Protein backbone atom coordinates (compact mmCIF):
# COMPACT_ATOMS: atom_id res chain seq x y z
CA UNK A 1 0.00 0.00 0.00
CA UNK A 2 1.19 3.51 -0.81
CA UNK A 3 2.81 5.22 2.21
CA UNK A 4 0.44 8.21 1.92
CA UNK A 5 -2.59 5.94 2.27
CA UNK A 6 -0.99 4.15 5.20
CA UNK A 7 -0.37 7.54 6.89
CA UNK A 8 -4.00 8.53 6.30
CA UNK A 9 -5.82 5.29 7.08
CA UNK A 10 -3.73 2.99 9.25
CA UNK A 11 -2.39 2.81 12.78
CA UNK A 12 1.06 4.04 13.77
CA UNK A 13 2.62 0.55 13.97
CA UNK A 14 1.58 -0.28 10.42
CA UNK A 15 2.88 3.08 9.21
CA UNK A 16 6.27 2.44 10.83
CA UNK A 17 6.48 -1.02 9.26
CA UNK A 18 5.83 0.49 5.78
CA UNK A 19 7.96 3.62 6.20
CA UNK A 20 11.26 3.93 4.32
CA UNK A 21 13.90 6.53 5.14
CA UNK A 22 13.23 9.60 3.01
CA UNK A 23 9.46 9.07 2.70
CA UNK A 24 8.95 12.24 4.75
CA UNK A 25 10.43 14.25 1.86
CA UNK A 26 8.36 12.65 -0.91
CA UNK A 27 5.20 14.13 -2.35
CA UNK A 28 2.16 12.02 -3.05
CA UNK A 29 -0.18 13.54 -5.63
CA UNK A 30 1.71 16.79 -5.09
CA UNK A 31 1.12 16.81 -1.33
CA UNK A 32 3.42 16.38 1.64
CA UNK A 33 2.98 13.19 3.64
CA UNK A 34 1.96 15.45 6.55
CA UNK A 35 -1.33 16.24 4.78
CA UNK A 36 -2.12 12.53 4.91
CA UNK A 37 -0.98 11.91 8.48
CA UNK A 38 -2.91 14.92 9.77
CA UNK A 39 -6.09 13.66 8.10
CA UNK A 40 -5.89 10.26 9.82
CA UNK A 41 -9.21 9.84 11.66
CA UNK A 42 -7.61 7.92 14.52
CA UNK A 43 -6.45 10.71 16.86
CA UNK A 44 -3.65 8.66 18.45
CA UNK A 45 -2.23 7.50 15.12
CA UNK A 46 -2.59 11.02 13.70
CA UNK A 47 -0.47 12.37 16.53
CA UNK A 48 2.15 9.61 16.51
CA UNK A 49 2.64 9.52 12.73
CA UNK A 50 2.76 13.30 12.44
CA UNK A 51 5.16 13.58 15.38
CA UNK A 52 7.40 10.98 13.74
CA UNK A 53 7.38 12.84 10.41
CA UNK A 54 8.08 16.19 12.07
CA UNK A 55 11.00 14.65 13.95
CA UNK A 56 12.30 13.38 10.59
CA UNK A 57 12.25 16.93 9.22
CA UNK A 58 9.16 16.84 7.00
CA UNK A 59 8.48 20.21 5.37
CA UNK A 60 5.72 22.12 7.17
CA UNK A 61 5.27 25.23 5.04
CA UNK A 62 3.09 23.55 2.45
CA UNK A 63 -0.27 24.37 0.88
CA UNK A 64 -2.59 21.92 -0.88
CA UNK A 65 -4.70 22.42 -4.01
CA UNK A 66 -7.52 23.89 -1.87
CA UNK A 67 -5.25 26.55 -0.38
CA UNK A 68 -5.22 24.77 2.99
CA UNK A 69 -2.18 24.52 5.20
CA UNK A 70 -1.48 21.84 7.79
CA UNK A 71 -3.48 23.66 10.50
CA UNK A 72 -6.63 23.58 8.34
CA UNK A 73 -6.25 19.83 7.88
CA UNK A 74 -5.52 19.05 11.54
CA UNK A 75 -8.28 21.23 12.95
CA UNK A 76 -10.91 20.04 10.47
CA UNK A 77 -10.88 16.52 11.96
CA UNK A 78 -13.90 15.66 14.10
CA UNK A 79 -12.22 13.66 16.88
CA UNK A 80 -9.29 14.99 18.86
CA UNK A 81 -7.13 14.41 21.84
CA UNK A 82 -7.00 18.14 22.58
CA UNK A 83 -3.66 17.92 24.40
CA UNK A 84 -2.07 16.21 21.39
CA UNK A 85 -3.78 18.53 18.92
CA UNK A 86 -2.49 21.53 20.88
CA UNK A 87 1.04 20.10 20.86
CA UNK A 88 0.90 19.60 17.10
CA UNK A 89 -0.49 23.11 16.54
CA UNK A 90 2.30 24.55 18.67
CA UNK A 91 4.96 22.67 16.68
CA UNK A 92 3.45 23.61 13.34
CA UNK A 93 3.18 27.29 14.26
CA UNK A 94 6.74 27.26 15.64
CA UNK A 95 7.84 25.79 12.29
CA UNK A 96 6.23 28.68 10.44
CA UNK A 97 2.76 27.43 9.52
CA UNK A 98 0.58 30.54 9.13
CA UNK A 99 -2.37 30.79 11.53
CA UNK A 100 -3.94 33.30 9.13
CA UNK A 101 -3.67 31.24 5.93
CA UNK A 102 -6.87 31.54 3.88
CA UNK A 103 -8.03 28.51 1.93
CA UNK A 104 -9.83 28.88 -1.41
CA UNK A 105 -13.10 29.43 0.46
CA UNK A 106 -11.48 32.15 2.58
CA UNK A 107 -11.60 30.04 5.75
CA UNK A 108 -8.99 30.57 8.42
CA UNK A 109 -7.74 27.69 10.59
CA UNK A 110 -9.37 29.56 13.50
CA UNK A 111 -12.80 28.89 11.97
CA UNK A 112 -12.23 25.17 12.53
CA UNK A 113 -11.36 25.83 16.18
CA UNK A 114 -14.62 27.78 16.57
CA UNK A 115 -16.59 24.87 15.09
CA UNK A 116 -14.99 22.10 17.16
CA UNK A 117 -17.44 19.99 19.13
CA UNK A 118 -15.74 20.59 22.46
CA UNK A 119 -16.40 23.05 25.28
CA UNK A 120 -14.48 26.28 25.76
CA UNK A 121 -12.88 24.69 28.81
CA UNK A 122 -11.70 21.68 26.81
CA UNK A 123 -10.37 23.93 24.03
CA UNK A 124 -8.48 26.22 26.40
CA UNK A 125 -5.05 24.77 25.40
CA UNK A 126 -5.77 25.69 21.76
CA UNK A 127 -7.02 29.14 22.73
CA UNK A 128 -3.82 29.76 24.70
CA UNK A 129 -1.70 28.88 21.68
CA UNK A 130 -3.80 30.87 19.24
CA UNK A 131 -4.15 34.05 21.19
CA UNK A 132 -0.50 34.37 22.11
CA UNK A 133 0.19 34.84 18.39
CA UNK A 134 0.40 38.27 16.78
CA UNK A 135 -2.22 39.53 14.36
CA UNK A 136 -4.89 36.87 14.80
CA UNK A 137 -7.52 37.48 12.12
CA UNK A 138 -11.01 37.27 13.60
CA UNK A 139 -12.91 39.52 11.17
CA UNK A 140 -12.08 38.03 7.78
CA UNK A 141 -15.22 36.92 5.94
CA UNK A 142 -15.26 33.43 4.45
CA UNK A 143 -16.96 32.53 1.13
CA UNK A 144 -20.32 32.49 2.94
CA UNK A 145 -19.83 36.01 4.30
CA UNK A 146 -19.16 34.96 7.91
CA UNK A 147 -16.16 35.80 10.07
CA UNK A 148 -14.84 33.52 12.83
CA UNK A 149 -16.07 36.14 15.32
CA UNK A 150 -19.60 36.11 13.85
CA UNK A 151 -19.68 32.32 13.89
CA UNK A 152 -18.58 32.28 17.55
CA UNK A 153 -21.26 34.87 18.44
CA UNK A 154 -23.96 32.47 17.26
CA UNK A 155 -22.72 29.63 19.46
CA UNK A 156 -23.89 29.67 23.08
CA UNK A 157 -20.91 27.57 24.22
CA UNK A 158 -18.18 29.92 22.94
CA UNK A 159 -18.31 32.72 25.55
CA UNK A 160 -14.65 32.37 26.55
CA UNK A 161 -13.47 32.25 22.94
CA UNK A 162 -15.68 35.19 22.03
CA UNK A 163 -14.20 37.27 24.84
CA UNK A 164 -10.69 36.62 23.53
CA UNK A 165 -11.64 37.24 19.92
CA UNK A 166 -13.17 40.63 20.71
CA UNK A 167 -9.75 41.80 21.91
CA UNK A 168 -8.52 41.36 18.32
CA UNK A 169 -11.32 43.28 16.58
Describe each model-derived feature in a short phrase:
Residues 47, 63, 67-69, 75-93, ...:
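Eukaryotic tandem repeat interaction scaffolds
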Residues 9, 40-44, 77, 95, ...:
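Ankyrin-repeat positional consensus site
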Residues 1-6, 95, 124-169:
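Ankyrin-repeat-protein effector appendages
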Amino acid sequence: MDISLVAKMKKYDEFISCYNEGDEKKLSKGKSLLFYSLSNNDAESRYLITDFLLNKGAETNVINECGENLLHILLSRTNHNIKQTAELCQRLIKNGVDINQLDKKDRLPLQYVVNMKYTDEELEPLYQIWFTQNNVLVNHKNAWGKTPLEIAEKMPYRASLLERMKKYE
